[in-house]
Every structure is written in C-alpha cells, then in structure tokens.
Amino acid sequence: MPRYLKGWLKDVVQLSLRRPSFRASRQRPIISLNERILEFNKRNITAIIAEYKRKSPSGLDVERDPIEYSKFMERYAVGLSILTEEKYFNGSYETLRKIASSVSIPILMKDFIVKESQIDDAYNLGADTVLLIVKILTERELESLLEYARSYGMEPLIEINDENDLDIALRIGARFIGINSRDLETLEINKENQRKLISMIPSNVVKVAESGISERNEIEELRKLGVNAFLIGSSLMRNPEKIKEFIL
C-alpha cells in the first residue's frame, strides 16, 4: 500500500487487507468484458457497463433488488459492475455470487483489490474480471496482481485518475484502462482532467470512462474522444430505465 494514502481510502484498503476469503465454486465460463466491448463498438452499439451499488462515499444511498436490476440491465448493457466492498458501498460477495448465477453477460467485480486472494474470490464467485486501482497499489503490487488475474483468463480494468497513474498503467502493459473523473481521496469530479487523460492513451487500449455520467450528450462527447465504454452507477441505480436513453 502506498504510504501517502489517508482518510477513507486508507481505511478501505486496510479493511481489504484483513478481509477473509469467501468459499464458492465457479459455475460459469469466463466471458471477456473488453472483447465484448469491442464487439459492441464494431456493431455501433453504445457499450454501457451498468453498475450495482447500494451506497457510496459520494452520497448515493439506494436499495434495489440486485437480481431484478441485473436481469433488466442484461438486455441493454455490455456488462455489469458489482460493488462488493462492505463498509462504504454496502456491497457483498454473496450479492455478486447471486448475480453471476442469474445473468450471462460479463461481470466486473469492483472492489479495492490489494491481494491475490481477492482475485481468487472474484473468480470463484463468478466474476469475469476485476478492477485494479493504480492509486492504492505500488507499481510492483499492481503488476503482480495484473499478471495473477491474467492467469485466470481475466483482463483487469486498470483504473487511473492522473498522469502518474497513466504512466504506471502503460508501463505494466495495461490493455484495458478505466479513466475515473472522480478523485478517490477528495471525491471531486474533474471532467477536464478525464478528457486530457483519454487523449493520452494509445488507440489500441480499450478505454472506459468512469464516474459522473448522467446524460446522453456526455456519452456522445466521450465517444468522439475515443472512449470505448461507459461505466455508469449512480444515475442508473436511481433510474434504471435511463439506460434506454443512453444506448439510443
């Protein structure tokens, strides 16, 4: 863990380090999220990764049935992102397991992953890939976890928020990068910074815009910049029907 982490982010990483493993047995084959995104792009279909989360440090607090939500999103989304962090997002491994056994589209386990056993859990629970956040790992840790996830046939989504993060992601050979407009420490959104980072990423990397997307015109603007997919959580949790507007 990098020494500079503080506040809720330091707390959530420490909780992740202590989190026990979950006993489960995978019931489905790996379905590649990044490859499905590229298929959507070829067919000119807007690739939305619909996120399921009950709450967040930025203010979301919504209760929806996870199976009902996921089955609805399965008809429109390229994949699902399932928050499994317990304290700050009210997520659970059990929710991920239930969703994975109910849908047949790719699933991203979104958590604060800091150790290999969490990747074991993701695979065993039925997730098809995991989120690795550059900000909460040393470069050596990040590279090791990336290779470990790939040993399962997963291509992790590597999340960045600034140029230093991007440099690290490219150095370790990231093929699938999430550009988060929200600073995880301050929780502030900076869309100009996100757009600048997008312009710096090579065209052969699959790019996902994360956080703060609530309108169709934002998706159109980001697509023109070369974004391949859009991870949307709060907006869809508040109003699931909005995905129909996003994919028009």
UniProtKB/Swiss-Prot annotation:
SUPFAM superfamilies documented for this protein: Ribulose-phoshate binding barrel
InterPro entries, sorted: Aldolase_TIM, Indole-3-glycerol_P_synth, Indole-3-glycerol_P_synth_dom, Indole-3-GlycerolPSynthase_CS, RibuloseP-bd_barrel
Enzyme class: lyase
Superkingdom of origin: Archaea
Pathway terms, separated by semicolons: Amino-acid biosynthesis; L-tryptophan biosynthesis; L-tryptophan from chorismate: step 4/5
Reaction(s) the record says it catalyses: 1-(2-carboxyphenylamino)-1-deoxy-D-ribulose 5-phosphate + H(+) = (1S,2R)-1-C-(indol-3-yl)glycerol 3-phosphate + CO2 + H2O
Assigned keywords, A-Z: Amino-acid biosynthesis, Aromatic amino acid biosynthesis, Decarboxylase, Lyase, Tryptophan biosynthesis
Span of the signal peptide: none
MF terms in GO: indole-3-glycerol-phosphate synthase activity; phosphoribosylanthranilate isomerase activity
Pfam families: IGPS (PF00218)
Any Gene Ontology biological process: L-tryptophan biosynthetic process
EC number(s) on file: 4.1.1.48
Self-association state and partner proteins as the record states: Monomer.
NCBIfam families on file: PRK00278.2-1
UniProt similarity note: Belongs to the TrpC family.
Name of protein: Indole-3-glycerol phosphate synthase
Source organism per UniProt: Saccharolobus solfataricus (strain ATCC 35092 / DSM 1617 / JCM 11322 / P2) (Sulfolobus solfataricus)
Lineage: Archaea, Thermoproteota, Thermoprotei, Sulfolobales, Sulfolobaceae
